[in-house]
Amino acid sequence: MEFKISKQLIQELEQLIQNKNDQQLEVLLNDMHHADIAEILDELDFNEATYIFKVLDSEKTAEILLELEDDLRENILSRLSPKEIAEELDELETNDAADIIAELSQDLKAEVISELLDVEHAKDIV
């Protein structure tokens, strides 16, 4: 069954974001496939997309990162700290993490690598 984004779903998400109802946001999005959430984030403005991204756990958002349009991914990454980006990369396969880290500036790349928990993973990424 193909996922369809409804206007009602977008409005509900926008209302939950406005009310900072993180728990209900998680409940609503938790069972959705990461590709479907990426589609939803693409329909929201950058602030709303970033808000949802920060509410969800890294296990889910790492996979979402891979599905996002380049400009949205770049915008969300620009709003995350090096530590938050490292948490995302720690959840990804080496080749996927390498693709994402390649999009970062040299300075940010160095900071993110220093934050990675798995030293072997960090070596393989760069």
Where are the language model's segments positioned?
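Hydrophobic packing positions in regular secondary-structure scaffolds
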Residues: 1-126
